[in-house]
Amino acid sequence: MGPGDLVLEIGPGRGALTHMLARRVDVLVGVEVDPELAARLRRELADLPHVHIVHADILSCDIGQIVLERARGAQGLRRFMVVANLPYCITTPVLHKLLSASPLFEAFTLMIQLEVAQKLTATAGSVGYGELSLMAQYYTRPEILFTVGPTSFAPPPSVQSAVVRMTVSKSPCAGDLDPGELFAIVRAGFAKRRKNIRNSLVSSALFGGDHDLVAAVLGSAGIDGRLRAEQLGLDEFARLARAAVALGAVHAVDRKSGGESGDVD
């Protein structure tokens, strides 16, 4: 990260990373939910006009609006990036929100729980593979850069952490599909992990017990209904989604390009 970059830092806290980033990038936007910490950072960085500390909850604010408003007037910006040391308790919802807003960004660099990092990079048939893996790999190319032990923190957590880089894919491999259509099928497939894909789809709200429709979708997609969802890769789920759309089982739903609106100070 350097000149020409806008960086969104989620949860800057006491500002250890914030102060370092402020010296390197052209625009820095920190979103902090704690009002006292946000006010403290504003005071400490008041002489740096390119640094913007926003008091808001990242889960309820509009990420795109926050970033684009702070980018206005800046010259020569080439890339928008995200940096965060995410609290374990909100890692998954923040990831979902970032992935939905991914077209705005070049990459995310995140410190997260190692178990979650392994889910992001998991492949079909491996431990931890699921909906989050598919979302991450549809929108980005995730990779684990390095692990961080508990002794690096005070107080030390009971789990390992990892730093991951998620480079945004500008041309998703299933780009012909609306993401809502694709992930409606993914969610239906993983709703009953212990069942095979046929039974999981049949029992989902999406298909409402329609055995014939599920059989038609599986047949059209060329998917063996005896397989489980965790055995199917992104390409197989994309084939299922295309078949479901063609047969009228799935419509354009759950379209998301950013976040929901929320209070920002």
Could you describe each region identified by the protein language model?
Residues M1-A188, G219, E230, R239, ...:
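Catalytic cores of RNA-modifying enzymes
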Residues S169-P172, S203, I223-D224:
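General structural signal for alpha-helix termini and helix-helix connectors
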Residues A184-A188, S200-A205:
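Short, glycine/charged-rich beta-strand-loop motifs at protein surfaces that mediate ligand recognition
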Residues F207-V245:
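RNA substrate-recognition surfaces in RNA-acting enzymes
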